């Protein structure tokens, strides 16, 4: 029987107090309370399209702005993801996804490599989506990548509506993550690396 791939992480600093939980083999259920509505909407895309159960509770210094909240949630989720994934034996490791939303199209390619790296090629058509600063999208992914130790390439190939651009990115990320962590029946107990470790 396959072990449960889930984890919980708490992160407390002078800027944020965060508790996250993730189940890599979930059903897409999310319980999100970051205090930033649009960000919760994007995290829901990861859960729903990644078929992962994700819980986020955050109290952040939103009287300043959302930067610390978004970045620190990325860090905590990256830590929880790495913890839940365990030794990585049997996973597919590499994956990609293209997701459209009306005029927008994004591509996400990732490698659960053990080496953190982010290539973020997105030119948003405006600086804010409602009250949400679009610069924080890359901050979230940088925080996640650094602590999940994955290589992640994000490209928005086209788009005129900034909300659509962001949503296609998060949906594609969820779908690619789901595919990469999937257990390959031909790789049971095998590390997906010629080095023997990731």
Curated annotation (Swiss-Prot):
Compartment annotation: Cytoplasm
Pfam families xrefs: IGPD
Organism: Methylobacillus flagellatus (strain ATCC 51484 / DSM 6875 / VKM B-1610 / KT)
CC annotations in GO: cytoplasm
Record EC number: 4.2.1.19
GO biological process: L-histidine biosynthetic process
Major subcellular location class: cytoplasm
Official protein name in the record: Imidazoleglycerol-phosphate dehydratase
Signal peptide start and end residues: none
Family: Belongs to the imidazoleglycerol-phosphate dehydratase family.
Pathway(s) of this molecule: Amino-acid biosynthesis; L-histidine biosynthesis; L-histidine from 5-phospho-alpha-D-ribose 1-diphosphate: step 6/9
